[in-house]
């Protein structure tokens, strides 16, 4: 409803209420006082017989008579009984008899005037209830209704052409849309329409965008709702809303129902703490029944999205409810290149902006990250009063997205600046001289976020996609993390070592313990996984992880972790000691320029015959 229509509706309602109030006031407070005197029937007959009355006006139904007042005042009113001798008495005494004609208009007017106020009150109450039912402030009569947004002719302004970098997921949903448009081509071969598609992937990979594209392409009614909109504070509301949603969907079949963040209502049953669990389970049970229960729902396709498939109930995940599970993962290099092309539309880019280079520098970025990256670059260009976005703004935006904005107003003393420079130079130098490790992308001692300085590495595309990390890579990772702490020890002495490496030490301890207890990379303990990994209690898992090893094994684990950390420490220290001159030069450049990129670092290493780290 438009704002003008809503305005006129409210004005009409207020006018109706004003009329009701005025009518009640006029009926109860402005009623005229009764000034006509009455005369009893006996006195009336006596006066007629005494020849004191010469004229009488009878009503049409002969129930009342009006008698002239001798004093000249208003006539007397006489209520007449059913007396058949009355006319004879009047004629015997020569009384002039006049009968008032019967008026139909007066009869209907009396009926209308009698019913006017009750009808007006009923109409006013009806409109008040209608407004309370549809208004945003009071939902007392609408709790059981579904809150799904319905688009009979989808106008999301998003098509599959706007979705890039996730071709496999797009193919799966394109087939679903094709099934809705050309069902005969599939049914002739005996194929059945899939009942549900579950989109699974990390946040920001484009799951909701895919659903919008389906709405834009399908040409069928599209219902969209969030999983959190089912359950309210009242018992039974969630199940009622599920029923209402599917009743609307069945009435508009074929159609698509999109449930975003389905993990809010589809979590595992029978686990967790708290009193709200039963209501959520009741809602989930109703959802399971509607999706594939005793009654079918032919023509309704459920598309759901979640980034927590591990907490979903197994009954919800089975074929027949969600026939397809589409993984929407982080895009690879080619996917990032396509996504950057899509988000670069409408932005004025300089000639030096290389989208290929940006795509290579951003492994692990999702579609939302890349969109935010170009938007931050555009904001920086506008802040600097530029007419186009250059590569400098893009580079600054990458740093801003990864580590937060620069803290240019923070003044660093020369001593602290030198300390941070050596710390970051230690990380970078060890990383650059470790065999088969991620290349250094950038070194900076400009404070960002909670960090005093940062060293960026470009992760390997293959390692990120496969999730497979070798033993040598993990050992190199620990050595690189220890490089900053060791550089402080070499330059300033063990007594001047700071707490700046606390996060690095936590990372080293975590990697070493995982190598021993999860990955079986301990020579002493062998290829075994120790310690049963359990999830949180609210995710439907055990309250605590079980310890499935003895105290002696725990002591051996601690010894192995300490040995791995010590080996990484010795390797990193050897690299920095053998390349002490390069370490000093790199720190001096950082103090002077505050930022060193990968090209400058490679030039420095090549000109000084850097010595690589020894293999383990």
Swiss-Prot record:
Cofactor stoichiometry and binding remark: Binds 1 zinc ion per subunit.
Transmembrane segments annotated in the record for this chain: 10-30, 109-129
Cellular location(s): Cellular thylakoid membrane
Membrane protein topology class: Multi-pass membrane protein
Binding positions (ATP): 201-208
Active site: 424
The keyword Disulfide bond appears for this protein: no
Lumenal side: 31-108
Needed cofactors: Zn(2+)
Single Gene Ontology MF annotation: ATP hydrolysis activity
Residues engaged in binding Zn(2+): 423, 427, 504
SUPFAM superfamilies documented for this protein: FtsH protease domain-like, P-loop containing nucleoside triphosphate hydrolases
Cytoplasmic compartment residues: 1-9, 130-616
Up-regulation conditions: By UV-B light and oxidative stress provided by methyl viologen.
Chief location bin: membrane
Deletion consequences: A homozygous disruption strain was not identified, suggesting this gene may be essential.
Free-text function comment from the UniProt entry: Acts as a processive, ATP-dependent zinc metallopeptidase for both cytoplasmic and membrane proteins. Plays a role in the quality control of integral membrane proteins.
Oligomer and partners: Homohexamer (Potential). Part of a large complex that includes FtsH2 and PSII. Coimmunoprecipitates with YidC.
Family: In the central section; belongs to the AAA ATPase family.
NCBIfam families on file: FtsH_fam (TIGR01241)
Name of the protein: ATP-dependent zinc metalloprotease FtsH 3
Organism ancestry: Bacteria, Bacillati, Cyanobacteriota, Cyanophyceae, Synechococcales
């Amino acid at each position: 409803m438009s704002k003008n229509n809503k305005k006129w509706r409210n004005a009409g309602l207020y006018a109706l209420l004003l009329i009701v109030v005025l009518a009640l006031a006029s009926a109860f407070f402005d009623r005229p006082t009764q000034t006509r005197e009455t005369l009893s029937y006996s006195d009336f007959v006596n006066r007629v017989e005494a020849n004191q009355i010469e004229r009488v006006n009878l009503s049409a139904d002969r129930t009342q008579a009006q008698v002239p007042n001798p004093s000249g005042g208003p006539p007397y009113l006489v209520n007449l009984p059913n007396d058949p001798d009355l006319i004879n008495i009047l004629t015997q005494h020569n009384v002039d008899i006049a009968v008032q004609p019967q008026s139909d208009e007066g009869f209907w007017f009396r009926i209308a005037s009698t019913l006017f106020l009750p009808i007006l009150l009923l109409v006013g109450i009806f409109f008040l209830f209608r407004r309370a039912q549809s208004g945003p402030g009071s939902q007392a009569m609408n709790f059981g209704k579904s809150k799904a947004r319905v688009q009979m002719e989808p106008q999301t302004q998003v098509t599959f052409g706007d979705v890039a970098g996730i071709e496999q997921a797009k193919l799966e949903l394109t087939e679903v849309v094709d099934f809705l448009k050309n069902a005969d081509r599939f049914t002739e071969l005996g194929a059945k329409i899939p009942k549900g598609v579950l989109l699974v992937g990390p946040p920001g990979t484009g799951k909701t965008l895919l659903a919008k594209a389906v709405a834009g392409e399908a040409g069928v009614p599209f219902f969209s709702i969030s999983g959190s909109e089912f359950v309210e504070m009242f018992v039974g509301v969630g199940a009622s809303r599920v029923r209402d949603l599917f009743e609307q969907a069945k009435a508009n079949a074929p159609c698509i129902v999109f449930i975003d963040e389905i993990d809010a209502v589809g979590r595992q049953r029978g686990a967790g703490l708290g009193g709200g669990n039963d209501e959520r389970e009741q809602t989930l049970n109703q959802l399971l029944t509607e999706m594939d229960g005793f009654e079918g729902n032919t023509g309704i396709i459920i598309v759901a999205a979640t980034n927590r498939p591990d907490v979903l109930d197994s009954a919800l995940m089975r074929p027949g409810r969600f026939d397809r599970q589409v993984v929407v993962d982080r895009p690879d290099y080619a996917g990032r290149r396509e996504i950057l092309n899509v988000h670069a539309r409408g932005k004025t880019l300089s000639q030096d902006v290389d989208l290929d280079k940006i795509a290579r520098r951003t492994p692990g970025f999702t579609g939302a990250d890349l969109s935010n990256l170009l938007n931050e670059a555009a904001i920086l260009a506008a802040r600097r009063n530029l007419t186009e976005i250059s590569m400098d703004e893009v580079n600054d935006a990458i740093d801003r997205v990864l580590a937060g904005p620069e803290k240019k107003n923070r003044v660093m003393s020369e001593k602290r600046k030198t300390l941070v420079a050596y710390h970051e130079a230690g990380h970078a130098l060890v990383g650059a001289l470790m065999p088969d490790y991620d290349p250094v992308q950038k070194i900076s001692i400009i404070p960002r976020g909670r960090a005093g300085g940062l060293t960026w590495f470009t992760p390997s595309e293959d390692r990120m996609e496969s999730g497979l990390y070798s033993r040598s890579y993990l050992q190199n990772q620990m050595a690189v993390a220890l490089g900053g702490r060791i550089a402080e020890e070499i330059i300033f002495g063990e007594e001047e070592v700071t707490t700046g490496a606390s996060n690095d030490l936590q990372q080293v301890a975590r990697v070493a313990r995982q190598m021993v207890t999860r990955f079986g990379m301990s020579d002493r303990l062998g290829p075994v996984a120790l310690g049963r990994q359990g999830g949180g209690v609210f995710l439907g898992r055990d309250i605590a992880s079980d310890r499935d090893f003895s105290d002696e094994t725990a002591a051996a684990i601690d010894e192995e972790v300490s040995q791995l950390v010590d080996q990484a420490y010795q390797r990193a220290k050897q690299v920095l000691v053998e390349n002490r001159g390069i370490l000093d030069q790199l720190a001096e450049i950082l103090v002077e320029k505050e930022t060193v990129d990968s090209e400058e670092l490679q030039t420095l290493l090549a000109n000084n015959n850097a010595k690589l780290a020894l293999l383990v």
